[in-house]
Amino acid sequence: MSATVEEIADDVQDLNVQEFDSDDAGADVHASDKVASRAERKSRKALQGIGLKKVGGITRVTMRRPRGHLYVIAQPEVYKSSHSDVYIVFGEAKAEDMSQLAQAQAAQQMAQAEAQERLLAESLQNSSASGAEKKVEEEEEDDDSPIDEEGVDAKDIDLVMQQVSCSRRKAVKALKESNGDLINAIMNAS
């Protein structure tokens, strides 16, 4: 069995395409590739005879209303009248309320501040817990020997203990290492 292939020639009609001259009024206003509503198509058709020129390079149009209301058109098609400073904008307008945006930003900042406070509190708890463990270990090591407070004032020992929250033994040791200097003793003990 053999198959045969036949070629069939169709008559194709040439379509007449009319080109508009750039001198025509409203030549820049044309139906875009986007799906347009019926009202938009009617508006474009009505504006073709006015003589509008398309303005390129505009990515966003914002119209401000009283009380902080904004109307934003993303990716607009903007046309300018050649006779006056009148602009016509096509696109989907979305309403934005600046007071709501400000409230949302304030709430977000508050949440971030609370998160930072929680992290700081956790880190302080962790450091104080590890510091308490170190203090217990140091006290256990030094509990066997008696405290030698010779050459150190009792008021200085109490002051170092209050400032650093350390044991009496550690305060005496820090004061002896710094030769009685309170500031250096506090820095060494902390």
Curated annotation (Swiss-Prot):
GO terms for MF: phosphatidic acid binding; phosphatidylinositol-3,5-bisphosphate binding; phosphatidylinositol-3-phosphate binding; phosphatidylinositol-4-phosphate binding; unfolded protein binding
Name of the protein: Nascent polypeptide-associated complex subunit alpha
Chain segments carrying region Disordered: 20-42, 123-155
Subcellular location as annotated: Cytoplasm; Nucleus
Keywords associated with the record: Cytoplasm, Nucleus, Protein transport, Transport
Quaternary structure, from the entry: Part of the nascent polypeptide-associated complex (NAC), consisting of EGD2 and EGD1. NAC associates with ribosomes via EGD1.
Gene3D superfamilies in the record: DNA helicase RuvA subunit, C-terminal domain (1.10.8.10), Nascent polypeptide-associated complex domain (2.20.70.30)
Residues annotated as domain NAC-A/B: 37-102
Comp. bias intervals (Acidic residues): 138-151
Residues covered by the UBA domain: 152-189
Family statement: Belongs to the NAC-alpha family.
Any one cellular-component term (Gene Ontology): nucleus
Domain of life: Eukaryota
Biased composition (Basic and acidic residues): 30-40
Coiled-coil intervals, chain numbering: none
GO terms, biological process: cotranslational protein targeting to membrane; protein targeting to membrane; protein transport
Keyword Protein transport in record: yes
Job of this protein: Component of the nascent polypeptide-associated complex (NAC), a dynamic component of the ribosomal exit tunnel, protecting the emerging polypeptides from interaction with other cytoplasmic proteins to ensure appropriate nascent protein targeting. The NAC complex also promotes mitochondrial protein import by enhancing productive ribosome interactions with the outer mitochondrial membrane and blocks the inappropriate interaction of ribosomes translating non-secretory nascent polypeptides with translocation sites in the membrane of the endoplasmic reticulum.
PROSITE patterns: NAC_AB (PS51151)
